[in-house]
Amino acid sequence: DITEVIAAGR
């Protein structure tokens, strides 16, 4: 899933 990737970029 990509949700973790965008969350890591916060």
From Swiss-Prot:
Keywords: Phosphoprotein, Ribonucleoprotein, Ribosomal protein. This is Large ribosomal subunit protein P2. The keyword Ribosomal protein applies. The lineage of its organism: Eukaryota, Viridiplantae, Streptophyta, Embryophyta, Tracheophyta. It comes from Pseudotsuga menziesii (Douglas-fir). It comes from the Eukaryota. Belongs to the eukaryotic ribosomal protein P1/P2 family. Plays an important role in the elongation step of protein synthesis. Phosphorylated. The keyword Nucleotide-binding does not apply. One of its GO terms (cellular component) is ribonucleoprotein complex. P1 and P2 exist as dimers at the large ribosomal subunit. Signal peptide: none annotated.
